Swiss-Prot record:
InterPro entries, per database record: Ribosomal_Su5_D2-typ_SF, UDP-acyl_GlcNac_deAcase, UDP-acyl_GlcNac_deAcase_C, UDP-acyl_N-AcGlcN_deAcase_N
Known catalytic reactions: a UDP-3-O-[(3R)-3-hydroxyacyl]-N-acetyl-alpha-D-glucosamine + H2O = a UDP-3-O-[(3R)-3-hydroxyacyl]-alpha-D-glucosamine + acetate
Protein name: UDP-3-O-acyl-N-acetylglucosamine deacetylase
Keyword set, alphabetical order: Hydrolase, Lipid A biosynthesis, Lipid biosynthesis, Lipid metabolism, Metal-binding, Zinc
Gene that encodes it: lpxC
Amino acid sequence: MIKQRTLKQSIKVTGVGLHSGNKVTLTLRPAMPNTGVIYCRTDMNPPVTFPANANAVRDTMLCTCLINEDGVRISTVEHLNAALAGLGIDNIIIEVDAPEIPIMDGSASPFIYLLLDAGIEEQNVAKKFIRVKKPIRIEDGDKWAEFKPYDGFRLDFTIDFEHPAIGKDVRNYVMDFSAQAFVQQISRARTFGFMKDIEYLQSQGLALGGSLDNAIVLDDYRILNEDGLRFKDELVRHKMLDAIGDLYMCGYNIIGDFKAYKSGHGLNNKLLRALLENQEAWEFVSFEDKEEIPQGYVSPAQVFI
């Protein structure tokens, strides 16, 4: 049986909020089987919880933001969510003492280290997957994203920025998902932004914690980070990281083929909602026999960073 997974123990880290620039403490705690992914604002009295849910995503302007019925929000959840998807964590309580998850280095890699440091524990309950049964496609102008049936989780992402530093050879990335592939190929890819956009955001009191330490920054001609890129196609890899985090907002690893062109948080979320709303397009599946599970979801004995 492929089992649900949680953490062996709680673990805590301190970082900076991307938009506030303030110190944020993040605590990750184990959770019982069938709990799912629960975000919790501990700076509120009483604490406010946000179960990971595609319909709770109500603001995708700059990041993926969960907002409850009372208008309380928790922002920048996508990189941590991607790490949870990457390692197949089904049940976890995520406590944060601020309105946003710390940005860390702008990638999912620090969260991978954190989760592996806490240790991953299998629970004696079958893990549920969402299997895509029929094609679903969402379009917005020339942007689009789609799911198709596939025995595994395949991702194909294309970006299209007219910029001297983003050549045509680094605009597409394709990956057959597995924990190992995610950790090595995707988790280290950092978020990116353009200097003119960042200056505008900061004038509006946003992105105050943004810096060359937690983002790739481009001016009109080049990449400003002294150490350059971690991968030549780091930008499109980060967009794939975002998509993996956005699609895990349903709380279940997906079995299907995801393909996107110029998609962002908003379109990723619309695609996930469209899938879930069409009862004939998907089904829950569990695997009693490890021989039946799609190759990418066979849990490795250990993940090499």
